[in-house]
Amino acid sequence: MKENLILKESEVIRILYPPGIVQTDDCYLDEEGRIYTTDTICEGTHFRIEWSGPKEIAQKLVEVNVSDIAAGGGIPTKAFLNLGLSTQCSKEEWILPFSISLQESLSSYNIELCGGDTYRSSSLNLTLTLIGVTTKPWKRSGGKDGDFLYLTGSVGLSLLGYKILKEGLDIPEPLRSLALERHLTPKARLKVSKELSKNSPVSCCMDLTDGLLLDLPKLASSSNLGLKIDLEKIPILSNILTYLSLGEVLSSGEELELIFLSPVELPKTLCETSLTKIGNTTSDWKGVKFFQGNSEKTFEHLGFEHF
């Protein structure tokens, strides 16, 4: 394939919508307060069957979709599943353990499986659609000048887990287990989202799926604001920078952490999850600028692309 024929995910999305229509949120909100999302995970793009078993794949499928609902300020209630099954998926060794894990993951969020479709595929393709409810929806376009930028948890673990599996990096415990867990079975921050929705003003929110270097510009663009990021405030677990460069950490995708704007100072922990203020919005420029002290920094790594 010629290089100029390879489109970025954002370009594909723009082409699909009619001229003048811009969809920047991961969820759709209807007039009755229902919130919808759908996400697909594909063999070779989002997981490898030599690394992930049916249990882990089912968990990841649920979590990435729940994460979208959490980023929209909603609570998931119903699910529809489309399964593209390859010839390697036998009933006993794959479909049954996948089904058990899927039901356990959905039940943990009180989500009802309502229907779907199955088909034969050359490789595994799994799509989950979630419907939820919300009384305080969060749109990416809701950011205001002077808002504080917050990040839940920490970043870098997912990419480190990928490198452990792909390159055989020798990482000591407990960092090794934390990295593998984040890469193979990341967890949505739904509890944090619920608590914020109840008690704290949130201007806008998104989940971290493509890395900070790609996702932060999306947030800034949607609210037509600039973001000033303090690199020294970004939460990175001890010793990760021994194995990854800072640019790689900022490119780590599928972390499923929440990035959100709020006009108020928030506590440093919520639902046993850290909340870190890593920057603020500004009307002085558009886009994202990273600072280390008073010096602006730029990075070559751009984050996780789906194409």
Swiss-Prot record:
Its EC number is 2.7.4.16. It catalyses: thiamine phosphate + ATP = thiamine diphosphate + ADP. Gene3D superfamilies: PurM-like C-terminal domain, PurM-like, N-terminal domain. Coiled coil: none annotated. CDD domains: ThiL. Mg(2+) 2 binds at D39, D68. Mg(2+) 1 binds at T38, D39, D117. SUPFAM superfamilies: PurM C-terminal domain-like, PurM N-terminal domain-like. Pathway: Cofactor biosynthesis; thiamine diphosphate biosynthesis; thiamine diphosphate from thiamine phosphate: step 1/1. One of its GO terms (molecular function) is thiamine-phosphate kinase activity. It comes from the Bacteria. Substrate binds at H46, E254, F304. It is an enzyme of class 2 (transferase). Mg(2+) 4 binds at D26, T37, D68. ATP binds at G116, D117, R140, T209. Mg(2+) 5 binds at D210. One of its GO terms (biological process) is thiamine diphosphate biosynthetic process. Keywords: ATP-binding, Kinase, Magnesium, Metal-binding, Nucleotide-binding, Thiamine biosynthesis, Transferase. Mg(2+) 3 binds at D26, D68, D207. Reaction mechanism of ThiL seems to utilize a direct, inline transfer of the gamma-phosphate of ATP to TMP rather than a phosphorylated enzyme intermediate. HAMAP family: TMP_kinase. Belongs to the thiamine-monophosphate kinase family. Catalyzes the ATP-dependent phosphorylation of thiamine-monophosphate (TMP) to form thiamine-pyrophosphate (TPP), the active form of vitamin B1. PANTHER family: THIAMINE-MONOPHOSPHATE KINASE. This is Thiamine-monophosphate kinase. It comes from Leptospira interrogans serogroup Icterohaemorrhagiae serovar Lai (strain 56601). The gene is thiL.
